[in-house]
Swiss-Prot record:
The expression of pepsinogen genes is regulated by hormones and related substances. Disulfide bonds join 107-112, 268-272, 311-344. It comes from Macaca fuscata fuscata. Shows particularly broad specificity; although bonds involving phenylalanine and leucine are preferred, many others are also cleaved to some extent. This is Pepsin A-4. The gene is PGA. GO terms for molecular function: aspartic-type endopeptidase activity. It is an enzyme of class 3 (hydrolase).
Amino acid sequence: MKWLLLLGLVALSECIIYKVPLVRKKSLRRNLSEHGLLKDFLKKHNLNPASKYFPQAEAPTLIDEQPLENYLDVEYFGTIGIGTPAQNFTVVFDTGSSNLWVPSVYCYSLACMDHNLFNPQDSSTYRATSKTVSITYGTGSMTGILGYDTVKVGGISDTNQIFGLSETEPGFFLYFAPFDGILGLAYPSISSSGATPVFDNIWNQRLVSQDLFSVYLSADDQSGSVVIFGGIDSSYYTGSLNWVPVSVEGYWQISVDSITMNGKTIACAKGCQAIVDTGTSLLTGPTSPIANIQSDIGASENSDGEMVVSCSAISSLPDIVFTINGVQYPLPPSAYILQSQGSCTSGFQGMDVPTESGELWILGDVFIRQYFTVFDRANNQVGLAPVA
């Protein structure tokens, strides 16, 4: 009987995984476009995806340079609860950053008016700090304070979690954002205030059985996407997972062997670095090879600054193949051409980031929708397999 009990406990310990459903909504770009505000927004805000990954040096006032314009195209969001009783927030689960922040009742900016606001006085488990935080973007900063509370994520009660409470959010555009805040899932080394990231705090408390999480992004317009904390669900992918070592432990950065089209190398001829980022919708790379790719697929810029493609051309376009750790990962045109409301746009975006390793690419949702992705902190590796 004791052996049966022990086996039962072992089985339970191997099953401590939690799934957080993600909902696909209209992006901030789409909301601004529908309100006739996109062109004006793009004129006033210089979009620079690179600034998310290589910010300016952090100052003693805990300034985190992560431009929120970089979430312009993000479409996948999940719900978390903060406090006791829980106050719910819609957040971006972002493997390209490490901090958690949400709007608070102390924020009177227009951007906060139509979002859920955290009220510390309504939580019996909230613990204040004297630390402040500032996230700089565009023409101003989101400023706020840091506090501790219980964060509920997919059934997990993550106690004593540090997070940011916004007090000011400049600019009108965040008013139209389909999310309240950001939940970062990258390494603690890039946490702006030295704050322990959510997943690290979860693992430190052994609230999950494995030091990893995985992501499935559905192409479905609304449901089916999920973040899995503490495990892997093989029903979301076909074949076996191929493992890729993390090359730099900060972002989820890996090495790419080459990028080809029709058997011809079009980029990354001598290898390059890439960041796997759920918080970036598009697939970005250096401006020169991206410009060549845009030309090859027949993309041209419209008045809103979008790279549009003829929808009728999709069936004749070739796959673009990323070879990673010796394994080929093809992206069909149905993946890298984004179709919405009868129009088609390119899923590629130019971005120049000088690094010691050379050119840098960002494998955003365009890539992750095709490949179930495991972020393995225990072994510092990323697992990839074709989605089921």
